[in-house]
Amino acid sequence: MELNGLRVSRETQARLQHFAALFQKWAKTINLVAPSTLDDLWHRHIADSSQIFQICPEPIRWADLGSGGGFPGVITAIFLAELQDGWAHLVESNHKKAAFLMTALRETEARGSVHAIRIEDAPAEIGECGAISARALADLDGLIGYAAPWMLGKENCRGFFHKGRDYLREIDEARGRWEFDLVEHKSAVEQESVILEISNLRRLV
């Protein structure tokens, strides 16, 4: 099996398929993603989320902010299980969604844990990480603000943020408050979308 050109082992494929089935079951009772996208779960959410691990396939500590339905946090944790190293810390303050995430990580035997706390409280609980991820959470300025406690002054910590067609405007707005190195990774799933890789973060104001 391949996802966006990434070769996926049988074990990882089985984990992803189990997660997809679990997701569809839970989505009937709690709002995990927009209902209109459920029929395209593999393409719109699973394949899209896997792109972050393709960009950064390293056994490091991740903090996934506002994990919601598990994208990209659970997907990253599933890929880390194949490496048998690294860890994904999923931050989700909604307790129903956090319960789903805990179930998903346990049943897929993924390498991750859930923190049912506010994002602002997460840095003190989680500690240092090598990567921060988020998808459909806030504008870039807001995301950088959330990630700043991990990233400021830390050359080895990078942010990976999914963004849609307005990403250039969001970059301009964020540069009014922050200075950072930026790599734009074009999405292999959504034509007008990107994954923004942020590093060497400095605060301007």
Swiss-Prot record:
Checking InterPro entries in the record gives: rRNA_ssu_MeTfrase_G, SAM-dependent_MTases_sf
Please indicate which superkingdom the organism of origin belongs to: Bacteria
Q: Report one GO cellular component.
A: cytosol
What molecular function terms (GO) are annotated for this protein? Answer: rRNA (guanine-N7-)-methyltransferase activity
The principal localisation class reads: cytoplasm
| E.C. code | 2.1.1.170
Keyword Transferase carried by entry: yes
**Reaction catalysed by this chain?**
guanosine(527) in 16S rRNA + S-adenosyl-L-methionine = N(7)-methylguanosine(527) in 16S rRNA + S-adenosyl-L-homocysteine
Q: List where in the cell it is found.
A: Cytoplasm
Keywords, A to Z, come to:
Cytoplasm, Methyltransferase, rRNA processing, S-adenosyl-L-methionine, Transferase
Residues at which S-adenosyl-L-methionine binds: 66, 71, 119-120, 135
Q: Does the keyword Methyltransferase apply?
A: yes
Q: What class of enzyme is it?
A: transferase
Q: What does this protein do?
A: Specifically methylates the N7 position of guanine in position 527 of 16S rRNA.
Read off the PANTHER family from this record.
S-ADENOSYL-L-METHIONINE-DEPENDENT METHYLTRANSFERASES SUPERFAMILY PROTEIN
Q: Could you say which protein family the record assigns here?
A: Belongs to the methyltransferase superfamily. RNA methyltransferase RsmG family.
The protein in question is named Ribosomal RNA small subunit methyltransferase G
- Which organism is the protein's source? Rhizobium etli (strain CIAT 652)
